[in-house]
Design a protein with these regions (language model features):
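N-terminal redox-cofactor-binding region of secreted/periplasmic oxidoreductases
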Residues: 1-540
Length: 540
């Protein structure tokens, strides 16, 4: 006999962990949380400075794009967290809410209740900001579960040079990009608490695992959602060699992320009918937008060598790592306490006071002169200190798709993001790179710089384009593949219910109709907070 729960949540990422916490707060609600990955017991997950060591490990789905015809036919690596906490356990820990105009734009598309004014309380509900007293309390909180902090336990002098150099060219210094004004150059705010990574699992899930009405199962690979007609009634998952079916009497909530939520919908019979037929899957409900509208942020590195050994690269040597580890475990200070990011800048690339459309990530790590490295392998990096500025395209025009490779749930989906398909995307990245050159020429950064902007001739746009295509990476912020809206390509309505199906919602980054102006983890926590409220208010 199948076990019966009120709510079944598929995926213990940022959204799933919030939902498990909020829905199980009422002891009358029985909640099951299913996660395909294992427990988050890899020590490297919890040490911010060990960020790169969790990629291409058992805690990473390790997806790849199809060959990108506009990026030298490269297949581009797509890390995705496969553990409790999902990608919040493997990401670079940046806490960025985006721009108020992003959410007002969602509301203008017909998504009532999704304006920035509507959503700010949900951002605040989760947050426990370590520097709350220095922030505007109208935008921040110190009473939530999610630890957020500025880089106070380790900081290089390079980031102050970056902020001052940005200020010198017209991108003003800004204490708080998550406050009233996003524009400007700032220290990064990170999901770190007491020197340890703060993930969805550590903040929301683990503190409530002792609730009798909450069951969390790891290594539970969901194969399909079960329907009775057009009503979602259960889930089938694999645990080892055993196939298990469980039933939900209230709702099933899909929080598997922008690649796997559409994949699971299609495997379960919801998607474009022709796509389902191709793989021999019976169509439960045709929804043409499933897997469409894929958007992601893109960036590439521009590096500099520094005059001094005040960065991070020299810590790569084994002896330095031992010393840093001692400082971390004994004093909770030093390089292991920090994310790979120290600074951010947000601005209108045309610098005409328009909407934020571009971002710079600043890292106190040099990626070397020739960029002939694996960006996800720390030991590929040079031992010479420096810094990297990464021009980041916030609002790509190109759109991609997620589709099935087969009807086998174990096979990865086909991910075709169509990077740089629209020429405007490349033009923006070129323009952003030229702006970085200007920043590097400012004395505030030149004070620390031995050699900047390697390895190409800055006067040649062709060489810059070649460099972009050679080094371009995703910031792994995929969104939009189960978009919210009221048009024919919308998969969910503004309450995140799947159109045409009862008792099924999608709650993760896939519901974003348009990508936000910044890193996407903070918005996913917010989406889950709002979804939990809507679910609990639903009369069944």
């Amino acid at each position: 006999m199948s076990q019966l729960y009120d709510y079944i949540i598929i995926g213990a990422g940022s959204a799933g962990c919030v939902l498990a916490n909020r829905l199980s707060k009422n002891p009358k609600n029985s909640v099951l949380l299913l996660e395909a990955g294992g427990p988050d017991n890899n020590m490297n997950i919890h040490i911010p400075g060990a960020y790169l060591k969790v990629h291409k490990s058992k805690n990473d789905w390790g997806f790849w794009t199809e060959k990108q015809v506009n990026v030298l036919n490269r297949k581009i690596y797509l890390p995705r967290g496969k553990t409790l906490g999902g990608s919040s356990s493997t990401n670079a820990m940046a806490y960025v809410r985006g721009n108020a105009a992003d959410y007002d734009g969602w509301a203008e598309l017909g998504n009532s209740g999704w304006s920035y004014k509507d959503l700010l309380p949900y951002f605040k509900r989760s947050e426990n900001h370590e520097q709350f007293d220095a922030m505007d309390s109208g935008y921040h909180s110190n009473s939530g579960e999610l630890g957020v902090t500025l880089p106070i336990r380790f900081q290089t002098p390079y980031v102050e040079g970056f902020i001052d150099a940005c200020d010198a060219i017209g991108i003003p210094a800004n204490l708080d990009y998550n406050g009233a004004i996003q524009e400007g150059a700032s220290l990064v705010q990170s999901t770190i608490k007491n020197g340890k990574r703060e993930s969805g699992a550590t903040a929301f899930l683990k503190p409530v695992l002792d609730r009798n009405n909450l069951t969390a199962i790891s290594n539970a690979f969901v194969e399909k959602i079960i329907f009775d007609g057009k009503k979602a009634v259960g889930v089938q998952y694999k645990k080892g060699v055993k196939t298990i079916q469980v039933k939900a009497q209230k709702e099933i909530i899909l929080s598997a992320g922008a690649y796997q939520s559409p994949q699971l919908l299609m495997l379960s019979g919801i998607g474009e009918a022709s796509e389902l037929k191709k793989h021999g899957i019976d169509c439960v409900h045709e929804s043409k937008g499933v897997g469409k509208n894929l958007q992601d942020h893109l960036f590439y590195p521009i590096c500099a060598q520094s005059k001094t050994q005040e960065g991070i690269n020299h810590y790569i040597s084994p002896l330095k790592q031992l010393k840093a580890a001692w400082n971390y475990f004994v004093h909770k200070k030093g390089v292991f306490c920090t994310s790979p990011l120290e600074g951010m800048a947000f601005f209108d690339l045309d610098q005409k006071g328009g909407k934020v459309n571009f971002q710079l990530h600043f890292s106190p790590i040099s990626m070397g002169n020739e960029y002939g490295y694996d960006a996800y392998d720390l030991y590929d990096y040079p031992r010479v200190d420096g810094f990297t500025i990464l021009p980041t395209l916030l609002h790509p025009k190109s759109r991609g798709t997620v589709s099935l490779s087969s009807s086998n749930p174990k096979e990865a989906p086909i991910i075709q993001p169509n990077f740089l398909k629209e020429k405007e995307d490349l033009d923006q990245l070129v323009k952003g790179g030229k702006l970085v050159f200007k920043i590097m020429e400012e004395q505030a950064l030149k004070n620390y710089t031995k050699v900047s902007g390697l390895p190409y001739n800055r006067t040649s746009e062709d060489l810059l384009i070649e460099h972009i295509k050679k080094t371009l990476e995703t910031v792994y912020h995929p969104v939009g593949t189960c978009k919210m809206g009221n048009d024919e390509m919308a998969v969910v309505d503004p309450t995140l219910k799947v159109y045409g199906i009862k008792n099924l919602r999608v709650v993760d980054a896939s519901i974003m109709p348009k990508i936000v102006s910044g890193n996407t983890n903070a918005p996913v926590f917010m989406i889950a907070e709002k979804a939990a409220d809507m679910i609990l208010k639903t009369k069944l």
